[in-house]
A protein has these predicted regions:
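Rieske [2Fe-2S] iron-sulfur-binding domain
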Residues: 2-9, 15-21, 26-27, 33, ...
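C-terminal catalytic domain of Rieske-type non-heme iron oxygenases
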Residues: 3-5, 71, 148-357
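Non-catalytic accessory segments flanking enzyme active sites
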Residues: 27-28, 33-35, 195-197, 207
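Short, charged, low-hydrophobicity "junction" segments
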Residues: 10-11, 251
Length: 357
């Protein structure tokens, strides 16, 4: 598969959950992300060879750094000595030296050296959280576990990110909205007939519909029962170690050969008020059709796709933070209710485990 990355605004490490779980109440987990699964972190090209990148993810501070050979590491952005930010320090190739006192932490979260006191008992101890990482589809993915589940959950990547007959473009953006609202928006196909009615790909079809939930081995479909292949008519929520959605929307003839385009979507919590969204826009095309699709996307279609995303961003960012506390839902919202209950149940279970563990 070929993937290009657009933005708007390696080596596997040993896991280490050194974060302080005392703040992980059910409400906190619901707002900043459940644990014990993988999340997309950022586009791979955000961290070039020899580079560092400071990030907030799931309400916590992290540091990515890449070695000259391309291998990638992620550390909690906290020096084990006095708690200073490692992201203020110096990249030493295979480790980070804290700016405050020079303490060196390698990619596994282990203290490699204490220059001010050689032989110090901190040396050789793994004291900094260092999540497992992989890179796929032009993005970095990380596993966020808790003390009871430090080893990464089994991960099955979306087939659209690994299939050689799929050509995709990664679109990345950061939105000032809670991550759950971004996920719920994807589980709400009917908004396409209204919010996106004037877009290049969602102007056709009925503005009335009935929906159903259809279970799958990896999640569930939420789909219209009276229309298919006309508009944003279905979405599948997939839980394969990482949560993602798949959907397809018909292209007009002006989009060239290759049939409908699909979207693999993910939302990663930054904190309770912000999220990072990842949308791989893909098409199953080969040979000259692949070349045509990629040319048309870059020259014509990309801006139109960003226009649709901008409509979503505006709508979601204008939602009140407590919008879900005063709703009057109806049949079209079955997908929203399903995913909301799913995450609430998992947040409560993980909070109980943190308390009893």
């Amino acid at each position: 598969m070929t993937t290009d990355t657009a933005t708007h605004t390696g080596e596997t490490t040993r896991p280490s959950e050194v974060a302080r779980p005392g703040n992980r109440t059910a409400d906190r987990l619901f707002d900043t992300g459940i644990r014990n699964q993988w999340y997309a972190v950022c586009p791979s090209d955000f961290v070039p060879a020899g580079g560092m990148k400071r990030l907030t993810l799931l309400g916590e501070e992290w540091l990515l750094f890449r070695r000259a050979d391309g291998s990638l590491h992620m550390l909690e952005d906290r020096c084990p000595h006095r708690g200073a930010r490692l992201s203020l320090g110096k990249h030493l190739g295979d480790r980070i030296a804290c700016w405050y006192h020079g303490v060196q932490v390698d990619g596994t979260g282990t203290v490699a050296a204490v220059p001010g006191l050689p032989g110090c008992n901190l040396e050789g101890k793994q004291l900094v959280a260092a999540p497992h990482l992989i890179e796929a589809g032009g993005a970095i993915l990380a596993y966020f576990g808790d003390n009871e589940h430090p080893e990464p959950a089994p991960l099955v990547l979306p087939e659209q990110l690994t299939d050689p007959d799929v050509s995709a473009f990664l679109c990345y953006a950061e939105w000032n909205v809670n991550w759950r609202y971004a996920v719920e928006n994807l589980l709400d196909p009917m908004h396409g007939s209204f919010l996106h009615r004037d877009s290049h790909s969602m102007s056709e079809g009925q503005t009335t519909a009935r929906f159903r939930i259809r279970e799958t081995e990896r999640g569930f479909f939420f789909e219209k029962t009276d229309q298919s292949g006309v508009n944003f008519d279905w979405v599948e929520l997939c839980r394969t170690g990482i949560d993602w959605v798949d959907l397809t929307i018909p292209y007009p003839p002006t989009a060239g050969p290759g049939g409908p385009f699909g979207i693999v979507g993910m939302a990663t919590p930054i904190d309770e008020d912000r999220c990072a969204v990842f949308f791989w826009r893909y098409r199953r095309v080969t040979d000259w059709q692949r070349d045509t699709w990629r040319f048309l996307y870059r020259t014509v279609l990309e801006d139109r796709h960003w226009d649709v995303l901008e409509q979503d961003r505006i709508m979601l960012e204008e939602l009140r933070s407590d919008a879900d506390q005063a709703e009057n839902l109806y049949q079209h919202d079955l997908g929203v209710v399903r995913v909301r209950r799913m995450y609430r149940t998992e947040a409560e279970a993980q909070a109980r485990a943190n308390t009893t563990g």
